[in-house]
């Protein structure tokens, strides 16, 4: 599983899986800026002392919800928090609040429409974290989810920061800071430097345009169109196995029912594997 995460590090940017990449150097004229636009404010400091990352590009919540459970079954919020799907979006905010909020934070949540009758002062964080604990492993390696940690470097040394809401302080509380701390996001992990790995706005990390997993999924799609369902499943499973996901055809949730079903599964696989 860790091999998936390590693909997007400088030491593996030219490994055998990378077929065609935009090659970058540690120089402002020969670089890419995903480290900044996909990042957060707890990346290493810029000349003014602020974290150099900006979360210009964030993860769509519907995309985050699309990640399967680890066993290949579909994720359903009601399995984690009964009644969640029937609640209004504003009311659901209560489940994303940090433990032991202050009176001011409570008043702000009420004003925003949160159903505070559902708030658990000592276990709110632990409850929402369960929604992300048993998912396709690529989710945790691609997305910073609520109350997950991120190894940042804004204070000059590597330090773990936690995605909490409402944000208070990255120095005193170790909260992960974003551009607009009044909002809570799903943030990117892929192509974002951890600790002090990528200390500049510009990044030397190569950007892959085509890698072997992409080839396998194209191959699977072609085989599926030729009605070779076993062949298509085999190619997709090569991708899923490396990531640590449940292989297709190995339990009740991963049985492929036909060509149309396989087409959708390949599309989903492309999303989860190639995000970023």
Q: Where do the PLM segments sit?
A:
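Structured-RNA-binding interfaces characteristic of tRNA pseudouridine synthases
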Residues: 66
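Acidic/polar-rich alpha-helix caps and helix-coil junctions
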Residues: 1-52, 73-276
């Amino acid at each position: 599983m860790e091999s998936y995460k390590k693909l997007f590090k400088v030491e593996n940017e030219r490994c055998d899986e990378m077929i065609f990449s935009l090659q970058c150097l540690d120089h402002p004229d020969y670089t890419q800026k995903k480290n900044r636009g996909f990042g957060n404010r707890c990346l290493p400091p810029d000349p003014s002392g602020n974290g150099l990352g900006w979360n210009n590009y964030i993860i769509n919540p519907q995309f985050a919800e699309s990640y399967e459970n680890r066993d290949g079954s579909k994720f359903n919020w009601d399995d984690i928090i009964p009644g969640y799907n029937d609640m209004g979006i504003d009311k659901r905010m209560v489940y994303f609040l940090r433990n032991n909020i202050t009176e001011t934070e409570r008043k702000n949540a009420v004003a925003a429409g949160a159903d505070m009758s559902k708030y658990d002062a000592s276990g709110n964080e632990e409850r929402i974290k369960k929604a992300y604990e048993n998912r396709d492993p690529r989710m945790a390696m691609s997305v910073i989810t609520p109350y997950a940690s991120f190894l940042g470097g804004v204070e000059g040394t590597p330090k773990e920061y936690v995605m909490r809401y409402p944000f208070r302080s990255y120095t005193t509380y170790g909260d992960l800071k974003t551009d607009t701390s009044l909002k809570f996001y799903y943030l990117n992990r892929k192509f974002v430097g951890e600790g002090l790995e990528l200390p500049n706005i510009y990044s030397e990390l190569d950007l892959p345009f085509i890698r072997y997993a992409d080839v396998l999924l194209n191959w699977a799609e072609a085989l599926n169109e030729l009605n070779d369902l076993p062949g298509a499943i085999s190619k997709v499973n090569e991708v899923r196995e490396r990531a640590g996901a449940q292989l297709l055809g190995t339990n009740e949730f991963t049985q492929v029912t036909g060509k149309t079903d396989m087409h959708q599964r390949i599309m989903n696989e492309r999303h989860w594997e190639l995000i970023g």
